[in-house]
Amino acid sequence: MIIELPRTLRFIARHFAGTRKFFAEKYMSDAVTACRFEHITYPFELAVMDGKRLIALAAGAIEAEEIELAKKYLTADDVVVEFGSGLGIAAARVHMAIHPKAHFCFEANPVAVAYSEHLFSMNEMQIDVDQRALGDGSTSPFYAADDYILSSFDVPKNTKHFKKIDIPTISLAAVVKEKKPTAIFCDIEGAEDAFLPPEDLQGVEKVIIELHPSHYGVHGVQRIKERFTKNGFVSVEQQQDTHCFLRR
């Protein structure tokens, strides 16, 4: 069975997170295999989500700000590269909305990569997924937690149930040279400060990026914005911590 919420319930579940537990209890059963939102079917897999998260997907609540900006500024003429694509939720919705010329995702977490590949295949989307992280080209330790959300390049603090694995990284300059993107979509949990230098964005016209003041403070956010400005970009819109930069 595939869950598809009525419009009113979608609105409630999207804007009032506390209601998702109630909806999960109402809709979830052993027969549920997926949910559907905006013509995209999301498989229900316990390895990466519970009932509440599936309801959030069915309501369009996950990564809503990033997706809204991408839909507004990206077009079918773009070659899109996404760093930190996670479960592929934003990638799928953006891909469905704009049908870009080409679409490449980079994600470190092997569990997330497996889910996103299943998601893209189920919805017949031509999106390439690369299990590498944005970095300096070296290999980096990654802590894969039993709870997908707690996985990190840092040792998880809220669980003891994880395993350490090695993940290859790739530099921004190498990605730009190989994929020739016109648009970058990025959410890498603070690593953007070190590994997404605007000076390496030759040929890139649009950057939608989530900044993380909890990692480097408000002064760090301002420093990153100034680096974009110095390298020919202008900030055109912000939704919460997600910023859109366009080349002048």
Describe the predicted segments one by one:
Residues 1-248:
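Phosphate/nucleotide-binding beta-alpha loop and adjacent structural elements of enzyme active sites
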